[in-house]
């Protein structure tokens, strides 16, 4: 299971988050999106070497998060169960498994609409 999918299941849990700049944030998770952006409510934020600040809500950009410290009584075994069904491998499509290089339905570089002019070497000289 991906980390983000696990974090998405943590709604309504109270966590401590440490940011890359040293700020400590404590609050209740309202939601986490696929970019790990985390939305909290009832937040206490302590900027490094400053006094704590109380906030109603706070959104944290995912790439600023260093640690998420989970509460001890959290039932990890139930949260880590991957309940998303696996995607089945698609059947090989015609032309899809042609190996490396260019190539689609009509082949590599040729095909219709190849550009200006006719045959290589130009047309007749006048």
Swiss-Prot record:
Keywords: Cytoplasm, mRNA processing, mRNA splicing, Nucleus, Ribonucleoprotein, Spliceosome. It is found in: Nucleus; Cytoplasm, Cytosol. Transmembrane segments: none annotated. Belongs to the snRNP core protein family. The gene is snr-3. SMART domains: Sm. This is Probable small nuclear ribonucleoprotein Sm D1. Residues 99-126 have a biased composition (Basic residues). Residues 2-74 form the Sm domain. Plays a role in pre-mRNA splicing as a core component of the spliceosomal U1, U2, U4 and U5 small nuclear ribonucleoproteins (snRNPs), the building blocks of the spliceosome. GO terms for molecular function: RNA binding. GO terms for cellular component: catalytic step 2 spliceosome; commitment complex; cytosol; P granule; pICln-Sm protein complex; precatalytic spliceosome; SMN-Sm protein complex; spliceosomal tri-snRNP complex. PROSITE patterns: SM. It holds the Pfam family LSM. PANTHER family: SMALL NUCLEAR RIBONUCLEOPROTEIN SM. Residues 86-126 are annotated as: Disordered. It comes from Caenorhabditis elegans. GO terms for biological process: spliceosomal snRNP assembly. The lineage of its organism: Eukaryota, Metazoa, Ecdysozoa, Nematoda, Chromadorea.
